[in-house]
């Protein structure tokens, strides 16, 4: 969910089933409406097939006010940020991902791969709800080698 929505971990952990599942219509929602904790800005996010598949795998008649990522000790509470970090780190190790991986890596990875697939940075700025283009550029993590590739491939 975090990887395919580009949400900050605090917003991911605060998600409840009512946010992703329409209990009246008995189906998953097409969009997620989030008021971002950090900025207070509202963001509407389309739930792609990867997210919907994961949600369908996990949904088992949970109550509307249950958290998607609930604490095993306190079911009426989400897991902690530190527990989320441990889960992400373990998943990175198990899949052979090296380097400094954190929960925020999920958000940044979405943008990087979107950018590599041709999504303009201005659109990513809107998706991220960033206040400046500079922040978005930093998220994309463009390295010198990638800048060099532009010069090698654009020959007028």
Summary of predicted features, one role per range:
Residues 80, 103-104:
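Residue-level marker of regulatory loop/turn positions in helix-turn-helix DNA-binding domains and
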Residues 34-36, 128-153:
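Catalytic-site neighborhood detector that most strongly recognizes the C-terminal catalytic loop/helix
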Residues 14-51:
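Conserved tyrosine-mediated DNA breakage-rejoining catalytic core shared by Y-recombinases
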Residues 48-98:
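Active-site/catalytic core of tyrosine-dependent DNA strand-transfer enzymes
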